[in-house]
Amino acid sequence: MAAKLKKGDKVVVLTGKDKGKQGEISSVNPSAGKAIVDGVNIAIRHTKQSQSNQGGRIPQPMPIQLSNLALLDANGKATRVGFKIEDGKKVRVAKTTGDVI
């Protein structure tokens, strides 16, 4: 099945403690159904000091379920993603506006 959300997409969080926050997808794990969004679902990780790393408390974005994310369309509103065949190629389409993503 084709991916509805991809790396670089602007998304909004629909549920959870970060509801309403917007960000860009930095990585997607389709097999786990999760994505990492910049600035969303931040956790503090304690790292030990080493020669290359200073150590301490480091904020790190954690994965979030794809079902809890919605793509932002050109108007800045959350939209669902559909697919359409154009010129023999399968393209992603915003359901609210019908624009090709």
Swiss-Prot record:
SMART domains cross-referenced by the UniProt entry: KOW
Role summary: One of two assembly initiator proteins, it binds directly to the 5'-end of the 23S rRNA, where it nucleates assembly of the 50S subunit. One of the proteins that surrounds the polypeptide exit tunnel on the outside of the subunit.
GO MF terms held by the record: rRNA binding; structural constituent of ribosome
Family label: Belongs to the universal ribosomal protein uL24 family.
Quaternary structure (record): Part of the 50S ribosomal subunit.
Coiled-coil annotated spans: none
Top-rank taxon: Bacteria
GN (gene name): rplX
GO biological process: translation
Name of this protein: Large ribosomal subunit protein uL24
Keywords: Ribonucleoprotein, Ribosomal protein, RNA-binding, rRNA-binding
Species this protein is from: Jannaschia sp. (strain CCS1)
Gene Ontology CC terms, in alphabetical order: ribonucleoprotein complex; ribosome
